[in-house]
Amino acid sequence: MAREVWLIVNRASGSNDEATLEALRAALDRADLAPARTLSVPDDPLPDRHALEAAGVELLVLFAGDGTANAALLPLDGWGGEALVLPGGTQNLLARALHGELSAEAIVGAFAELVPTRRHRVRSRHGDGLCEIVAGPGATWSEVREALREGTIGELAAATSEAVAQTSSGPMVSLADPPLGKPEGYPAVRLHPAGDAIAVDAYGAESLADYARQGLAILQRDFRQGPHDTLGRHRTVLCRSDAAIELMIDGERATGGREERFTIAPFGVTLLAHPDRDRA
């Protein structure tokens, strides 16, 4: 008996044009996973846990970016179904963590091989990150990615110029508890789940060339390629700055206070993953 499947897509995410969506639907059909309902963000509201339970949904397929995946999955904490996250956005950090560099069609084609897994999340008072939270003026690079996806060349140039200025001259963020890295801080601190701890990577730059390389790494969709210090794994981290700390939570912007504490916590939704991938 076929399971009840719902599909969430974001047509403004990544390269989700109609042809791409039709190819995905065909792949789902071949895998006997034809969705009973398709929800298109932002036109349709995201379903909550009670809506999925009332409809008997057993599998929720997400073909969208990290921000949409975050918004869709976090309210489902404790739901008894399974979620399949496919790469349908700009960076696709969560999909890459679960499936590597496989395409959405390849992941669906190998559905029978996927294994259920649980991950942790990085918690903050401004929202939880399933993939990462970036703290510091380097968080403004999220606007460059937005301009890259939706804007004109002029908007991209303006966003890039502003991000470089903010990263090079904005208030640094230090790691106060536990005390880690450079006392003067960094323009970007990346906190991401690693098992039952927070892995801390601090991105600094001593010259304009370093900033340029870091910006290029972000635009190339892999923040981790930028020059950085690896500062270990911790259950909790307190960041401090002389000004409000800019945040990027799974690609979405937020503004914190001068001190922000981050903790690790289990995430109570079962995700399907490639059997060879490390799970956080």
Residues of each region from the PLM?
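ATP/NTP phosphate-donor binding region
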Residues: 1-63, 70, 74, 78, ...
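Hydrophobic beta-strand segments of well-ordered beta-sheets in folded domains
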Residues: 2-7, 36, 83, 171-172, ...
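Short, solvent-exposed amphipathic alpha-helical segments in soluble enzyme
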Residues: 22-26, 77-78, 146-147, 215-220, ...
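Short solvent-exposed loop/turn micro-motifs enriched in small/polar/acidic residues
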Residues: 54-55, 113-116, 166, 182-184, ...
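Glycine-rich nucleotide phosphate-binding loop and flanking beta-alpha elements
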Residues: 67-69, 245
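Catalytic core of DAGKc-family lipid kinases
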Residues: 77-199
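ATP/nucleoside-binding phosphotransfer catalytic cores, i.e., glycine-rich phosphate-binding loops
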Residues: 204-280
